[in-house]
């Protein structure tokens, strides 16, 4: 696994828009304030040509232009890391126009983004053997003040963070809108983890610890990549089978039945054959129940059969805040009741 160099004080942060750009509010103002904050912190900035573009469908521009931007800016020596402008809908089409041979030959650099950016973070690990950070996109850094999760994410890029913890509360409903683009997360809900060992719920005060190599992202994107020419998951699993895999997964548009279908699909594709544990984020359909199926049984239908720890409702994904996850890194996870710690090991 290749680990990028840390961004140094005074270094250059690059911004790209392989999914949505920051053309409309509240993202336009939030991205502008993020740039202001980074400059005040002493960093140089390099903006890709699509950061404010809105010509594309489900992404900032045409797939060709988005793929070209992503390839050129990742391989460029004029920036030291890349932060994606945002998530979106069709970044998979961007990846058809990314030159992965150039990415593999380039000096690795940190790439930060989540949601649709799974198309980059997952493929960097499985195709390019390069670590990246599954975490907040550029506009989030415009909030006033920063949430601790943003400090943690930027700390990973700087090399100052090697351990992340769960956050006290999470956001059920965002207050950020066109009139209030810089509002921080509206954290009102206490963090309550649902921990299982196989199908058995963990007891009060029970300490759970497991380690392995982190792989995963947004399930919507992962099952879309599965079986395509970009799916090199099998080779990755064999290379790192002695480490075992910690699968981190979260869902955006999937309802509870779609989550269960996604888990079945990944299981039948052999993706979970060396699993050491699951980290499951709060799904956007949090609290949904359909025909007797809830978000927990949707996951446990497969994960519960593996006799490994399954930690659900973790700070991960579309219901902020999220612990930034270093995709491809070795990690040790420690859980007790509602407390969770992830310690990264760059080997």
PLM-predicted stretches and their roles:
Residues 213-252, 256:
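Oxyanion-binding "anion nests"
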Residues 15, 82, 116, 222, ...:
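Buried hydrophobic positions in well-ordered alpha/beta secondary-structure cores of metabolic enzymes
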Residues 256-347:
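C-terminal active-site/capping subdomain that shapes the small-molecule cofactor and substrate pocket
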Residues 1-78:
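ATP/NTP phosphate-donor binding region
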Residues 75-98:
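Long, hydrophobic/aromatic-enriched structural stretches that serve as scaffold segments
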Residues 81-83, 112, 246-248, 279:
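Structural motif
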Residues 98-124, 131-139, 309:
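Short, acidic/small-residue loops that bind anionic groups at enzyme active sites
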Residues 133-220:
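Conserved anion/nucleotide-ligand pocket segment
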């Amino acid at each position: 696994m290749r680990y990028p160099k840390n961004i140094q004080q005074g270094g250059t942060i690059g911004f790209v828009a392989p999914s949505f750009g920051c053309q409309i509010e509240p993202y336009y103002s939030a991205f502008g304030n993020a740039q202001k904050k980074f400059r005040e912190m002493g960093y140089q900035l390099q903006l890709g040509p699509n950061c404010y573009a809105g010509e594309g469908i489900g992404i900032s521009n045409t797939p060709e232009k988005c793929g070209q931007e992503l390839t050129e800016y990742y391989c460029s020596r004029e920036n030291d890391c890349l932060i994606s402008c945002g998530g979106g809908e069709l970044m998979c089409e961007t990846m058809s126009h990314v030159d992965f041979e150039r990415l593999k030959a380039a000096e690795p650099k940190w790439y930060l983004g989540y949601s649709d950016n799974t198309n980059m973070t997952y493929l960097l690990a499985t195709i390019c053997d390069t670590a990246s950070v599954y975490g907040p996109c550029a506009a989030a850094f415009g909030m006033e003040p920063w949430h601790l999760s943003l400090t943690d994410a930027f700390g990973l890029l700087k090399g100052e963070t090697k351990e992340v913890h769960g956050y006290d509360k999470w956001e059920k409903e965002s207050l950020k809108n066109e009139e209030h683009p810089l509002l921080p997360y509206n954290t009102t809900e206490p963090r309550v983890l649902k921990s299982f060992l196989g199908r058995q719920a963990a007891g009060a005060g029970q300490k759970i610890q497991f380690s392995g190599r982190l792989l995963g992202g947004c399930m919507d994107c992962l099952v879309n990549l599965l079986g395509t020419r970009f799916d090199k998951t099998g080779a990755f699993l064999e290379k790192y089978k002695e480490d075992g895999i910690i699968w981190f997964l979260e869902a955006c548009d999937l309802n509870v039945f779609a989550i269960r279908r996604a888990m079945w699909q990944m299981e039948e594709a052999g993706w979970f054959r060396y699993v050491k544990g699951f980290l499951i984020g709060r799904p956007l359909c949090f609290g949904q129940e359909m025909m007797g199926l809830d978000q927990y049984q949707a996951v446990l239908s497969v994960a519960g059969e593996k006799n490994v720890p399954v930690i659900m409702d973790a700070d991960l994904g579309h219901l902020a805040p999220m612990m930034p996850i270093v995709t491809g890194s070795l990690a040790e996870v420690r859980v007790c009741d509602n407390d969770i710690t992830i310690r990264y090991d760059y080997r």
